[in-house]
A protein has these predicted regions:
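Short-chain dehydrogenase/reductase
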Residues: 8, 46, 50-51, 106-109, ...
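Conserved beta-strand segments that form the floor/walls of ligand-binding pockets within enzyme
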Residues: 23, 95, 124
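Rossmann-like NAD(H)/NADP(H) cofactor-binding core
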Residues: 22, 64, 121
Length: 134
C-alpha cells in the first residue's frame, strides 16, 4: 500500500492539469474468499485511498481504479489441460464464465483515462465475478 500511496502522492504533483491517475486493485477488494485476506485488504485500501485522493486533487486531475477478476496471464504457471481446469474452476460461476484477457483489462484502464467525466470510482473488469452465485 505504501508503494501506491507514494506513487500517487509524488506523481500527482507532476500530472498535467486535466490528467489522470489509474490504480489497479482486484475483485477480492470487495469480496474476500478464504485465503485472500492480504489481497483483499490491500485492494480495499487502494480503492479507499483512491476515493479520498479524488476529493483532494479534483478538479485539476482525476484518479480511478480498475479492478480485474480472474485474468489469463503468464502469472499462472500451470500449463495445458490443468490450466484450463483451474480457470474453469475459478470462473464457472461468473456471469461470463471464463478468465479475462489482459487486453480486456487494458480497455478498462483506457476507459477511465480517456473519459473526462469519470473520477473517484472503480471499474470492475471481472466477467461478473462480484455478482456470481456462491
Amino acid at each position: 500500500l505504501w508503494g501506491y500511496a507514494n506513487v500517487v502522492r509524488y506523481g500527482a504533483m507532476h500530472v498535467s492539469d486535466g490528467g489522470s491517475i489509474t490504480l489497479v486493485s482486484g475483485a477480492p477488494a470487495r469480496n474476500c474468499l478464504p485465503g485472500q485476506v492480504a489481497l483483499s485488504s490491500v485492494g480495499n485500501a487502494v480503492e479507499a485511498m483512491m476515493r479520498a485522493v479524488a476529493r483532494e486533487v479534483a478538479p485539476r486531475i482525476r484518479i480511478n481504479a480498475v479492478s480485474p477478476g480472474t485474468i489469463d496471464t503468464p502469472m499462472f504457471t500451470v500449463k495445458g489441460t490443468e490450466r484450463e481446469a483451474l480457470y474453469r474452476q475459478m470462473t464457472t460461476n461468473n456471469l461470463i464464465p471464463r478468465a479475462g484477457m489482459a487486453d480486456e483489462v487494458a480497455q478498462g484502464i483506457l476507459f477511465v483515462i480517456e473519459n473526462n467525466f469519470v473520477t473517484g470510482t472503480t471499474v470492475d473488469v471481472d466477467g461478473g465475478w462480484l455478482l456470481r452465485e456462491p
